[in-house]
Every structure is written in C-alpha cells, then in structure tokens.
C-alpha cells in the first residue's frame, strides 16, 4: 500500500544521506537503485519495470564510469529523491513524474557531453 511505499522511500533517502556523508559509493548506488525500483514496482507499469530491468546494467556502467568520484552529484541525487518523494507524499503525482523524468535526464548530461567531445576531437593518425 501507499503508506508502506512512502515509509520505504523515506528510509532509503535517509540512508542515502548517510552514505553520502560517509562517501560509501557502492552502498549509495545500491540505495539509488532501490529508490527507483520501489517507485517503478509500485507504479504497476510492467513496461516501465521491463525498460528499467533491460537497461540497468548499462546504467550501472554509466554511473560507475562518470559519477564515482562526484560527491556533489551524490548530494544532488539525494536532494532530487527528496523532491520526488515530497511531491508524491503531497499527492502531486504529475509533479513527482516530472521530477523523476528530469532526474534521469540530468544524469545523462555528462555522458552526452563526453560523447560530444569525443566526436569533435580530431582523429589520431
């Protein structure tokens, strides 16, 4: 039920905050996945869950390469999770959905920038 989901999400966000303070990268990533998966599972949207499952290995690789040493990004992630959860708790599901979409899109920006730089670099002889 919704109260259980909210309690679980609150617990995950609280744990994430502690992991950022302790610079516990692997635990933070595990909690990040738990946060997203909890929302997706509760949505009842099988297509969304399948898309998440189909792309999680690629996503984990992306995160490991581009975000591992970026503690400020971890802090931003926790803040975004708080905002998503707050909107959800307030019953503003449209806002929660928009915040979740923005959260995912923002995470892709460093990868796009890196790929653009590689495309613009002159080829080595």
Locations of the language-model features?
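C-terminal effector-binding regulatory domain of bacterial HTH transcription factors
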Residues: 93-125
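Conserved amphipathic alpha-helical segments that form helical-bundle/coiled-coil interaction surfaces
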Residues: 2-66, 79-87, 95-106
């Amino acid at each position: 039920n919704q109260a259980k989901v909210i309690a679980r999400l609150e617990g995950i966000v609280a744990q994430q905050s502690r992991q950022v303070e302790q610079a516990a990268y692997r635990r933070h990533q595990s909690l990040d996945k738990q946060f997203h998966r909890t929302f997706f599972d509760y949505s009842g949207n099988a297509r969304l869950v399948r898309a998440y499952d189909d792309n999680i290995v690629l996503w984990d690789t992306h995160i490991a390469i581009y975000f591992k040493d970026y503690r400020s990004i971890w802090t931003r992630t926790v803040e975004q999770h708080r905002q998503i959860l707050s909107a959800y708790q307030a019953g503003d599901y449209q806002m929660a959905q928009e915040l979740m979409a923005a959260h995912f899109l923002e995470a892709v920006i460093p990868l796009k920038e890196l790929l653009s730089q590689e495309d613009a670099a002159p080829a080595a002889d």
